[in-house]
Amino acid sequence: MAIDAFLGKWCLISSEGFDEYMKELGVGMAMRKMGSMAKPDVYIIKDGDTITVKTESTFKTSQFSFKLGEKFEENTLDGRKTQTLVSLKDDGSLIQEQEWDGKKTIITRKLVDGQLVVECDMNGIKCVRVYQKA
């Protein structure tokens, strides 16, 4: 499966374990409350071999751009500066690995029955967020 299958606008329809995952990341309580309440739209855009992921909510908008397989510095929504690598696996999943201060989290995006399923994992604390194509 090519990256093109991920392109478009995606709207959050369900979220499980997000508060616990944000806590494991080190996100403060006020920002966790806002993050848990937000129903973000995610835009995945491709321009040549550069891919941009833009997350928009009523609270905050952020975006990052990358080329598959090339490490880059990402400024996350919660204020972390990470070294990030995004790769497309043979099974069609998009794997985003963030490293900072000796810590690591892995965000896996995959398409399941036409929905974008985002699985986040840090130290075994997992969350699953499901998006419907707009």
UniProtKB/Swiss-Prot annotation:
Binding site for (9Z,12Z)-octadecadienoate: R129, V130, Y131
Residues annotated to bind hexadecanoate: R109, R129, V130, Y131
This protein's record includes keyword Transport: yes
GO process terms (BP): lipid transport
Record keyword Iron-sulfur present: no
Motif (Nuclear localization signal): 23-33
Coiled coil: none
Pfam families the record matches: Lipocalin (PF00061)
Family, per entry: Belongs to the calycin superfamily. Fatty-acid binding protein (FABP) family.
Subunit-structure text: Monomer.
Name of the featured protein: Fatty acid-binding protein 5
